[in-house]
């Protein structure tokens, strides 16, 4: 019997990969990886490893979750060391829990290797601390995508005014609903907000607005996935603490000279 390692690849910058994740990738016989995994990380796999792309776009899956689960079980039963490589952290909106359940039910040994989630890392690369003693004593990590419409409606009632900082994953498609539900349930429309596109990578772009202009900003700035939404007064710290995109601009300028 082999073993499956459910591994977080981090938010995009390959240098944010953990040492334990790197060791697992180097030893793996089979690696099943998602779309948001930086392909540079795959260079650490051994030459004879099987690399299987499971890429998932919003509303379109190259490989269905049930198929991925079957592959994990099949390769482990063949005695392989399997790495299931997922962007960010596998247990933060990454279906890692579902995959671990499947392995447990089938008697497959497994291990979880956490990764740095984009909700913290992308915000940090945009100069936004998700908590701050003067602006945010609590934070909620939220998915903007729900299996059931009624779940979407109900959750936002609690989130609108009870949480200082909202970090929203997969929220672009439903941004109009998010804006509407926050405003309907008492969130101040002037609350600062940020979109962080391709956070921690050389394609990172941060766009700033307010809660009452979320949906129009998506259209105006042509914001697409993968993008993180951060809402709360902590967003204003960007103007003091921004560092990464300034470095990218300096690099672009030096290369142009």
Curated annotation (Swiss-Prot):
Residues holding S-adenosyl-L-homocysteine: 11, 87-89, 117-118, 170
InterPro entries: 4pyrrol_Mease, 4pyrrol_Methylase_sf, 4pyrrole_Mease_sub1, 4pyrrole_Mease_sub2, CobA/CysG_C, Siro_Cobalamin_biosynth, Uropor_MeTrfase_CS
EC number: 2.1.1.107
Highest taxon above the source species: Bacteria
Pfam families found in the cross-reference section: TP_methylase
Keywords: Cobalamin biosynthesis, Methyltransferase, Porphyrin biosynthesis, S-adenosyl-L-methionine, Transferase
Gene3D superfamilies with a match to the protein in the record: Cobalt-precorrin-4 Transmethylase, Domain 1 (3.40.1010.10), Methyltransferase, Cobalt-precorrin-4 Transmethylase, Domain 2 (3.30.950.10)
KW Methyltransferase (keyword) present: yes
Record-annotated membrane-spanning stretches: none
Signal sequence interval, chain numbering: none
GO terms for MF: uroporphyrin-III C-methyltransferase activity
Induction: Up-regulated by sulfur starvation and repressed by cysteine. Also induced by O-acetyl-L-serine (OAS), a direct precursor of cysteine, maybe via inactivation of a putative transcriptional repressor of the cysH operon whose activity is controlled by the intracellular levels of OAS.
Pathway in which this enzyme or protein is active: Cofactor biosynthesis; adenosylcobalamin biosynthesis; precorrin-2 from uroporphyrinogen III: step 1/1; Porphyrin-containing compound metabolism; siroheme biosynthesis; precorrin-2 from uroporphyrinogen III: step 1/1
GO biological process: cobalamin biosynthetic process; methylation; siroheme biosynthetic process
Reaction it catalyzes: uroporphyrinogen III + 2 S-adenosyl-L-methionine = precorrin-2 + 2 S-adenosyl-L-homocysteine + H(+)
Described purpose of this protein according to its UniProt entry: It is a step in the biosynthesis of both cobalamin (vitamin B12) and siroheme.
Family matches, as NCBIfam families: cobA_cysG_Cterm, PRK06136.1
Protein family according to the UniProt entry: Belongs to the precorrin methyltransferase family.
PANTHER family noted in UniProt: S-ADENOSYL-L-METHIONINE-DEPENDENT UROPORPHYRINOGEN III METHYLTRANSFERASE, CHLOROPLASTIC, SIROHEME SYNTHASE-RELATED
Name this protein carries in UniProt: Uroporphyrinogen-III C-methyltransferase
Gene: sumT
């Amino acid at each position: 019997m082999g073993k499956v390692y459910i591994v977080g690849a981090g938010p995009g910058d390959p240098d944010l990969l953990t040492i334990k994740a790197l060791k697992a990738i180097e030893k793996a016989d089979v690696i099943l990886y998602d779309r948001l995994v930086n392909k540079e990380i795959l260079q650490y796999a051994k030459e004879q490893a099987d690399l299987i792309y499971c890429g998932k776009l919003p509303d379109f899956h190259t490989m269905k979750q049930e198929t991925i689960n079957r592959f994990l079980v099949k390769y482990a039963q063949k005695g392989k060391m399997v790495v299931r490589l997922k962007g960010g952290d596998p247990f933060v909106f990454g279906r890692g829990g579902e995959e671990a359940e499947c392995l447990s039910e089938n008697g497959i040994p497994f291990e979880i290797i956490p990764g740095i989630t984009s909700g913290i890392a992308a915000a940090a690369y945009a100069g936004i601390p998700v908590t701050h003693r003067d602006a945010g004593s609590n934070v909620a990590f939220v998915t903007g995508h729900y299996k059931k419409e009624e779940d979407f409606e109900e959750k936002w009632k609690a989130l609108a005014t009870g949480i200082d900082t909202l970090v929203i994953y997969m929220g672009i498609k439903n941004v109009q609903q998010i804006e509407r539900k926050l405003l309907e349930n008492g969130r101040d429309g002037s609350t600062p907000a940020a979109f962080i596109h391709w956070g921690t990578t050389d394609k990172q772009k941060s766009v700033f607005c307010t809660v009452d202009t979320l949906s129009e900003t998506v259209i105006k700035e042509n914001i697409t996935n993968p993008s993180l939404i951060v809402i709360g007064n902590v967003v204003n710290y960007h103007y003091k603490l921004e560092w990464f995109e300034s470095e990218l601009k300096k690099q672009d300028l030096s290369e142009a000279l």
